[in-house]
Amino acid sequence: MLVTGVDLIEIDRINQAVSRWGQRFARRVWTEAEWLRCRDSAQSLAARWAAKEAAAKALGVGLKGIGHPACAVAWREIEVANDTQGKPLLRLHGAAQQRANELGIRHWSVSLSHSGDQAIAFVVGMG
């Protein structure tokens, strides 16, 4: 089984949401580790947002608070971490991991990028 997802977001949308809602918004979307690593970079936060959206698309589910209430996972159940060389990697928790198990997906690859006013993420899941 092979699943893919991609998402593109305007960095300013994330910057505005963080400015307006602060920690309340951050705690809903990013894990503590993600926030500590990226809180000073709207570009990095936006890229991780895009990765969460892309992963949800690959899993065939929505994210809580954005439609699909019957089959949604929480934002923090999809985590973007980094290996020792800084390469992004995907960690799933809770309902997101359960859905990956249902699909037979055991390995993930994630690519993040940003340029100008946009950030993009591409996610591939393999059985």
UniProtKB/Swiss-Prot annotation:
Organism of derivation: Herpetosiphon aurantiacus (strain ATCC 23779 / DSM 785 / 114-95)
Subcellular location: Cytoplasm
Family membership: Belongs to the P-Pant transferase superfamily. AcpS family.
Enzyme Commission numbers on file: 2.7.8.7
Superkingdom of origin: Bacteria
Catalyzed reactions: apo-[ACP] + CoA = holo-[ACP] + adenosine 3',5'-bisphosphate + H(+)
MF GO annotations: holo-[acyl-carrier-protein] synthase activity; magnesium ion binding
Gene: acpS
The protein, known as: Holo-[acyl-carrier-protein] synthase
Enzyme class: transferase
Cofactor or coenzyme needed: Mg(2+)
